[in-house]
Amino acid sequence: MANAALIEALRAADAVQFGEFELSHGGTSSYYVDKYLFETDPRCLKLIAEAFAERVADDDKLAGVALGAVPLVAATAVETNKPYVIARKKAKEYGTAKRIEGALDEGEEVVVLEDIATTGQSAVDAVEALREAGAVVDRVVVVVDRQEGAAELLADHDIALESLLTAEDLLADADG
């Protein structure tokens, strides 16, 4: 069953919007889930961190995909008292020039936390970077799965997709 409190919080934060929107992959949609509105809303952030915490195993290290999932993974780290790493899309060209920020040991089991899954490509990229760094990753947990192919793409890379909410959950009974 969908998390009714989280749905209500996302709607109250105006994070679910209706109209014509261009998505990051170039497609268009009649609705938009504004991650910046829910990631900067304390009530949403608390509910998300609590829900993510329920899905994290005792031996999991947390990882967040930069930039969008950083507030989510940080809040979940506080909720679970677990350290986390940040997976960048590409290495910085300055400083340490790393794709993975934070301490990560070879063989550590990592669960990736992400904001929204549409195609799933950013999650796949993060998992590949973590695996290249020696992590064992087989699971991504997202706030919202837009149900537009992410689960299938991730499955092709031996990654399970779990979501707190699906587009179907979020749009049920919506006034759009």
Curated annotation (Swiss-Prot):
Transmembrane segments: none annotated. Coiled coil: none annotated. One of its GO terms (molecular function) is magnesium ion binding. Its cofactor is Mg(2+). The keyword Transferase applies. Homodimer. This is Orotate phosphoribosyltransferase. It comes from Haloferax volcanii (strain ATCC 29605 / DSM 3757 / JCM 8879 / NBRC 14742 / NCIMB 2012 / VKM B-1768 / DS2) (Halobacterium volcanii). The lineage of its organism: Archaea, Methanobacteriati, Methanobacteriota, Stenosarchaea group, Halobacteria. The gene is pyrE2.
